[in-house]
Amino acid sequence: MIDTIKVNNKTIPWLYVERGFEIPSFNYVLKTENVDGRSGSIYKGRRLESYSFDIPLVVRNDYLSHNGIKTHDDVLNELVKFFNYEEQVKLQFKSKDWYWNAYFEGPIKLHKEFTIPVKFTIKVVLTDPYKYSVTGNKNTAISDQVSVVNSGTADTPLIVEARAIKSSSYFMITKNDEDYFMVGDDEVTKEVKDYIPPVYHSEFRDFKGWTKMITEDIPSNDLGGKVGGDFVISNLGEGYKATNFPDAKGWVGAGTKRGLPKAMTDFQITYKCIVEQKGKGAGRTAQHIYDSDGKLLASIGYENKYHDRKIGHIVVTLYNQKGDPKKIYDYQNKPIMYNLDRIVVYMRLRRVGNKFSIKTWKFDHIKDPDRRKPIDMDEKEWIDGGKFYQRPASIIAIYSAKYKGYKWMEMNGLGSFNTEILPKPKGARDVIIQKGDLVKIDMQAKSVVINEEPMLSEKSFGSNYFNVDSGYSELIIQPENVFDTTVKWQDRYL
């Protein structure tokens, strides 16, 4: 049987695996110790190690093959494109229903004078020595219990997704009364008090309650500009995209505004946006916060101000009663972000008394569309020593813009989450999970997010990420009758 390989589900039609290749498996290495005066050695244990091997490949290069006769450079260039990855890839034999997470190592050696057929080898490096089933599994909890059947020959990690049908101070999942993972606080002697109620939380799927900004420009050098453009629903119905940009100089864009249901003295405001940075260009998008008099109080947003470079940054600026700006946060993307084509950016501004806290994080939307693995995270605190920025937050606006005369790096708002912070009752437990929140736990990536916010800091001391063994396992969810929970896993093999 002629077989070929798939790399991230891609194949080359004229590339085949040479017959006779032996698939390596079960790479256990024993640890032993010699003892003087004793025959043999003492068994100290075993471990599953990483390993590498060569896959012999054949290039079909005749008139009947795909694209006919190919030159040395034609083949080499296609092979380089096929194998050139810095990160792990899914490596699968087309005839098998499992794959490795693999790296490739050079060199690729092709004979200068092509023969029929052309043979070469590619070195595969497995830092993760397991095989994974191509088909995933999932099961839904019934009465806060969920069964997991791992049909593989090795233990395997889980992905847990739990939607809160009530607010809660914690979420916990246990395995066979052996292992458990918990985020939050379940101390029964503390009363549960929800002192952080949502005031206005919205994903941008419609314009209900919003008013287009026509003449009221946004006086922010960092994140403002000329208004008058329009927003349309974009990103598969989940975002505000600016269109019909006004004819003016400088930053031009679209803005929309609304009042909050109530003014907030202490608050937590999160703005999320998506940035299309596959191509170069300048752009900015922000949420602006106003006081009850309609004066600008704060701006939180993302900007790429270079038309020929992909160097975005997150900016937070405060404004006093006179409108004078005070930039308290300016965080430039780490270099790992520059090569990503599409990113989702979260910015959170929290004010309690005279202390401002900023938390930002991002997701690679191409490789992590479910947003389980936050990257480029940062936090900072700033004290308003003179108490110049204490006015209540009453109105919010969303603004997206490009710079006139230059290519636009498209940036679209995805959502705005505005929460009031009331005085914390003495001895109360924090309600870290609100009704409707989605808790996501990735046991392999060792990440936990609540409503796409990284919450590893809330992981309970003593709990840990765990795998389920080969065969049957029973998982229990706590607290009872609070979460709709689904567990996902892949069978894993030695």
Residues of each region from the PLM?
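Short, aromatic/His-centered strand-loop micro-motif at the edge of beta-sheets
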Residues: 315-348
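Extracellular/lumenal carbohydrate-interaction signature centered on repeated Trp-anchored short motifs
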Residues: 257-269, 336-343, 466-468
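Extracellular/virion structural assembly segments
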Residues: 1-200, 263, 276-297, 417-494
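Carbohydrate-binding surfaces in secreted/extracellular proteins
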Residues: 269-271, 336-384, 447-450
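Broad, structure-driven detector of short, well-ordered beta-strand segments within folded domains
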Residues: 296-306, 345-351, 394-399, 439-442
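Flexible glycan-contacting loops in extracellular carbohydrate-active proteins
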Residues: 369-412, 467
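Secretory/extracellular carbohydrate-interaction modules
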Residues: 207-324, 412
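Extracellular carbohydrate-recognition regions
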Residues: 151-153, 178-235, 408-411, 420
